[in-house]
């Protein structure tokens, strides 16, 4: 590996601000805020607005928006039953 061209890669704690879920991972990002992890070591903390613990897709709270297409609009206009019903 060529010296001096790669970013500093180290372990950080990612903290989901919504659910207080924490996980330890490697990153090139750093922070002045630190926290002690379960192994007793202190790591920089990166705060996240959303993670797999709070994202609706991963938690099962996802809502599917039914976008009416041209066929659905035609069926509504002429009184045909929807193909989804």
From Swiss-Prot:
GO function term, MF aspect, one: structural constituent of ribosome
Gene3D superfamilies: Ribosomal protein L31
GO cellular component: ribonucleoprotein complex; ribosome
The keyword Ribonucleoprotein belongs to this UniProt entry's keyword annotation: yes
Alphabetical keyword list: Ribonucleoprotein, Ribosomal protein
Domain of life of the organism encoding this protein: Bacteria
NCBIfam families cross-referenced by the UniProt entry: L31, PRK01678.1
Family affiliation: Belongs to the bacterial ribosomal protein bL31 family. Type B subfamily.
Protein name: Large ribosomal subunit protein bL31B
Source species of the chain: Macrococcus caseolyticus (strain JCSC5402) (Macrococcoides caseolyticum)
């Amino acid at each position: 590996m060529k010296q001096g061209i790669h970013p500093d890669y180290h372990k950080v704690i990612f903290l989901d601000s919504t659910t207080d879920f924490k996980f330890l991972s490697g990153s090139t990002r750093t922070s002045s805020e630190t926290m002690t992890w379960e192994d007793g070591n202190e790591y920089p903390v990166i705060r996240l607005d959303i993670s797999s613990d709070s994202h609706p897709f991963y938690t099962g709270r996802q809502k599917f928006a039914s976008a009416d297409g041209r066929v659905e609009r035609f069926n509504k206009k002429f009184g045909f039953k929807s193909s989804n019903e």
